[in-house]
């Protein structure tokens, strides 16, 4: 089974993130032999993250909290380092939580 980690930095925009997770979950439901994990890097948000409803097709959601706001690029770098040091995976995908990236393109993998 192929393991794909989707790294998503977020700062306060939890509603957009929840929508994105729903779109990812819907997109991957028909993809066979795949394990999808989402790693959310919280860029020291001042709004407390909500409890997410457990998606059906995303197997795991982790949230890493930055101690201070460092910006989008630093969140990506922190997440990439974390994944390389702590996870066994086949592919790492970076997505923005603001809806700019299209989860439908996951089907092209």
What are these regions (language model features)?
Residues 13-17, 45, 102:
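Donor nucleotide-sugar binding loop of glycosyltransferases
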Residues 88-100:
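Short beta-strand-to-loop acidic/aromatic patch adjacent to the donor-nucleotide binding site
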């Amino acid at each position: 089974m192929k393991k794909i980690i989707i790294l998503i930095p977020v700062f306060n925009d939890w509603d957009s993130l929840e929508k994105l997770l729903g779109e990812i979950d819907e997109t991957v439901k028909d993809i066979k032999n795949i394990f999808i994990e989402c790693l959310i890097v919280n860029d020291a948000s001042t709004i407390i993250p909500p409890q997410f409803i457990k998606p059906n097709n995303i197997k795991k959601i982790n949230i890493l909290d930055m101690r201070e706001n460092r910006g989008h690029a630093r969140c990506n770098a922190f997440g990439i380092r974390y994944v390389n040091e702590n996870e066994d995976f086949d592919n790492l995908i970076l997505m923005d939580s603001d809806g700019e990236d299209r989860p439908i393109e996951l089907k092209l993998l």
